[in-house]
Amino acid sequence: MAPSPDHARDLYIELLKKVVSNVIYEDPTHVAGMITDASFDRTSRESGEDYPTVAHTMIGLKRLDNLHRCLADVVEDGVPGDFIETGVWRGGACIFARGLLNAYGQADRTVWVADSFQGFPELTGSDHPLDVEIDLHQYNEAVDLPTSEETVRENFARYGLLDDNVRFLAGWFKDTMPAAPVKQLAVMRLDGDSYGATMDVLDSLYERLSPGGYVIVDDYCIPACREAVHDFRDRLGIRDTIHRIDRQGAYWRHSG
């Protein structure tokens, strides 16, 4: 008996997760922060707690599973809108999203790839105190963070997923988000780490999120990022339950 189309689709999606996170070839990690051993560690890779030297994403399998579920939900529930990730590194999560939407036959949904493509910005006196305290700019060289738009495009092309449904928004979020040509969103995935980057995206794009859509916050564990989320939600009176994905990420579903 031939496998069902749904079975073949699901096999492709599960394989794509393993490829973008590179749990197949097990590349080592950069030594930075609390990581002192460069050896591949499967537990750290699955939970997205290392800095891969080769893999196209560092969010790990648990957060890829969450992205899978959120995207599948909006497709199956008929929630209209596109997908955006703000802070994409090498593009792996966006590549996964494009592959999944393609596998579900979602020809009308765009994947928006938003990043400075320069790593974290240098801080100024006007930045939020929690951003100044953590100073993410120091990680740019330590974990090979800055990735050019050209490299991310090449990564999409390697998977055969660089098409007209993939659009790039290059620049700092404070500049690109207010005028972003995004009309409607079904899933927005925030991975800017800082208070400023998180707030810039929420302020500009949350109103474009369809009821039933998802907000995923990759770095909810970082105090600056978490405070931005709660400041924004308190200001708008958002009471939708925040669910933890793992030790780092969280999400909520927009009740409308």
From Swiss-Prot:
SUPFAM superfamilies: S-adenosyl-L-methionine-dependent methyltransferases. Optimum pH is 7.5-8.0. The keyword Transferase applies. Mg(2+) binds at residues 191, 218-219. InterPro entries: SAM-dependent_MTases_sf, TylF_MeTrfase. One of its GO terms (molecular function) is macrocin O-methyltransferase activity. The keyword Lipoprotein does not apply. S-adenosyl-L-methionine binds at residues 57-58, 85-89, 115-119, 173, 191-192. It catalyses: macrocin + S-adenosyl-L-methionine = tylosin + S-adenosyl-L-homocysteine + H(+). The active site is at residue 65. Keywords: Antibiotic biosynthesis, Magnesium, Metal-binding, Methyltransferase, S-adenosyl-L-methionine, Transferase. Its EC number is 2.1.1.101. Belongs to the methyltransferase TylF/MycF family. This is Macrocin O-methyltransferase. The lineage of its organism: Bacteria, Bacillati, Actinomycetota, Actinomycetes, Kitasatosporales. The gene is tylF.
